[in-house]
Amino acid sequence: MERYQQLFKQLAAKKEGAFVPFVQLGDPSPAMSLNIIDTLIAAGADALELGIPFSDPLADGPTIQNAALRAFAAGVTPGICFEILAEIRQKHPTIPIGLLMYANLVFHNGIDHFYQRCAEVGVDSVLIADVPFEESAPFRAAALRHGIAPIFICPPNADDDLLREIASHGRGYTYLLSRAGVTGAENHGQLPLNHLVDKLREYNAAPALQGFGISEPAQVKASLAAGAAGAAGAISGSAIVKIIEKNVAQPVEMLVQLTRFVTEMKAATRS
């Protein structure tokens, strides 16, 4: 959890926002997945948001569903994902690592065991996409027991009660949803969400990172804009996974394009 606090402190001192890429672990293969993640970090990623492939991903659009299918085709299992995570943490001791998950994978060997594994490999946060806040108590209790930040989604239509609950129980960062629906770069995020960011800040919530439909530098700038009213950073998934998908057969070109994309998105976080 402390890694997020350190990160936001350092970025605030530099007057920068956070740029956080999302990829599926093991896509398109375990070895290439590690190369991709090393490349994202080298290109300027401030933190990582990583998925463990799941067979029925309700919140994901076709791009991220296909990434899971590629990982499954390469024989990726949750166990292999934890091995990849341990390796990332060993190489990159300071970067915050977040998991974006579905509840079935957390339940599989017991909630407590799952968070214990996360702690062992150096994961900082877990967001469970299909668990609404009202049902999150057992997950967040296990997370905190093991020093893992429970992350909550703040939807664009959140009412005051939900904002207070998220502020009270969330740690690490708050996932600010640009819009309802499934993930996908073609579905642009709708702005502005400044009133939500204001309220979250008023209630001392963990810093807001805006995600869903963030696929170009101008959107990163927009999500951070409005001075103190903007989000603390942006998460981009589908646009990155599309680069992987288009270049599966040409890994060198893939890494070149990923470097270019992340460099441009990170540059947009600097005021």
Curated annotation (Swiss-Prot):
<keyword id="KW-0822">Tryptophan biosynthesis</keyword>
<dbReference type="InterPro" id="IPR011060">
    <property type="entry name" value="RibuloseP-bd_barrel"/>
</dbReference>
<keyword id="KW-0028">Amino-acid biosynthesis</keyword>
<comment type="pathway">
    <text>Amino-acid biosynthesis; L-tryptophan biosynthesis; L-tryptophan from chorismate: step 5/5.</text>
</comment>
<comment type="subunit">
    <text>Tetramer of two alpha and two beta chains.</text>
</comment>
<dbReference type="Pfam" id="PF00290">
    <property type="entry name" value="Trp_syntA"/>
</dbReference>
<keyword id="KW-0057">Aromatic amino acid biosynthesis</keyword>
<feature type="active site" description="Proton acceptor">
    <location>
        <position position="49"/>
    </location>
</feature>
<feature type="active site" description="Proton acceptor">
    <location>
        <position position="60"/>
    </location>
</feature>
<keyword id="KW-0456">Lyase</keyword>
<dbReference type="GO" id="GO:0004834">
    <property type="term" value="F:tryptophan synthase activity"/>
</dbReference>
<dbReference type="InterPro" id="IPR013785">
    <property type="entry name" value="Aldolase_TIM"/>
</dbReference>
<dbReference type="GO" id="GO:0005829">
    <property type="term" value="C:cytosol"/>
</dbReference>
<dbReference type="InterPro" id="IPR002028">
    <property type="entry name" value="Trp_synthase_suA"/>
</dbReference>
<comment type="function">
    <text>The alpha subunit is responsible for the aldol cleavage of indoleglycerol phosphate to indole and glyceraldehyde 3-phosphate.</text>
</comment>
<protein>
    <recommendedName>
        <fullName>Tryptophan synthase alpha chain</fullName>
        <ecNumber>4.2.1.20</ecNumber>
    </recommendedName>
</protein>
<dbReference type="InterPro" id="IPR018204">
    <property type="entry name" value="Trp_synthase_alpha_AS"/>
</dbReference>
<comment type="similarity">
    <text>Belongs to the TrpA family.</text>
</comment>
